[in-house]
């Protein structure tokens, strides 16, 4: 799988800098990658990016890994065909997180940014009526379990926070959730100047905006403390989230509305039945 790619022709990130106006701690310090023996010199997000050769090596490895997984999924689907059970089997494929390949001068995962929280999610097989179609509706991982329950004819537990996606599997353009939510605990790692406390980031993503609120976090009591910072990104103007608009006066009302919606939480965002 490594040999499938010409490293020199692979695209590199063109926004190898932290979002303008965002707090230094919001871009993760790539602790996972930094633990490898040959990556101890990985720059912190606010420093100059790695040289192009190192970037291309990592991007090459990522593409090779994706191709490997693609081949394994193919083996699974071939087995379902061979056993004659493909048509009455529900197949769901999703990524558990996004991945930075130099974007925001970061690598790996673990932020509240779009690059780390947006993933592919594919339903195939039994019960999927809108074959070979895509939906731009806002969906979340918590939606997968209730969807599988309904597709399998099982009762959907009332206490779940997710919504069955069965209506979208027939009508991909159907009006759906008002927002999706994510949450990330930033521990005591990253650049030395950002390690004085742990922080919890709460994020809401609407059709147009991503809004994040950061709070001090008490890991012992599992409670949030003082507000530390906010981030606001307009995806119509800035799909790569390169400029934090939280302190832009022209977005003050938008920020206030999004903050209220974030506080109201997932119940506010549920699709109308």
Predicted regions and their residues:
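Active-site-proximal cap/lid insertion segments
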Residues: 1-88, 92-138, 151-159, 220-227, ...
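C-terminal, low-complexity/hydrophilic appendages and adjacent surface loops
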Residues: 114-117, 185-247
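Short loop segments at secondary-structure junctions
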Residues: 125-128, 153-155, 171-173, 207-209, ...
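Short, flexible helix/strand-to-coil boundary loops that buttress conserved ligand/catalytic motifs
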Residues: 105, 169, 246
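Polar, surface-exposed loop/tail segments
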Residues: 86-92, 131-204, 251-261, 273
């Amino acid at each position: 799988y490594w040999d499938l790619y010409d490293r020199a022709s692979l695209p590199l990130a063109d926004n190898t800098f932290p979002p303008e106006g965002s707090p230094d701690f919001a871009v993760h310090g790539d602790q996972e990658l930094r633990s490898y023996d040959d990556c101890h010199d990985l720059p912190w997000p606010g420093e100059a990016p790695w040289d192009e050769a190192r970037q291309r090596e990592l991007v090459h490895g990522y593409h090779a890994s994706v191709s490997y997984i693609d081949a394994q999924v193919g083996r699974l689907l071939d087995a379902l065909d061979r056993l004659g059970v493909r048509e009455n089997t529900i197949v769901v494929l999703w990524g558990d997180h996004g991945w930075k390949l130099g974007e925001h001068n970061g690598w790996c995962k673990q932020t509240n940014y779009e690059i780390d929280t947006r993933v592919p999610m594919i339903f195939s097989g039994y019960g999927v009526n809108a074959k070979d179609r895509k939906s731009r509706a806002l969906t979340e991982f918590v939606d997968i379990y209730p969807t599988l329950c309904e597709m399998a004819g099982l009762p959907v537990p009332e206490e779940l926070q997710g919504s069955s996606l069965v209506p979208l599997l027939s009508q991909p353009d159907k009006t759906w959730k008002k927002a999706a939510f994510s949450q990330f605990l930033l521990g005591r790692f990253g650049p030395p100047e950002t390690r004085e406390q742990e922080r919890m980031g709460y994020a809401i993503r609407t059709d147009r905006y991503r809004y994040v609120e950061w709070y001090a976090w008490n890991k012992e009591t599992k409670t949030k403390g003082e507000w530390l910072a906010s981030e606001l990104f307009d995806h119509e103007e800035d799909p790569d989230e390169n400029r934090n608009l939280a302190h832009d006066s022209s977005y003050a009302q938008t920020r206030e509305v999004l903050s209220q919606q974030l506080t109201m939480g997932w119940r506010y965002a549920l699709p109308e039945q």
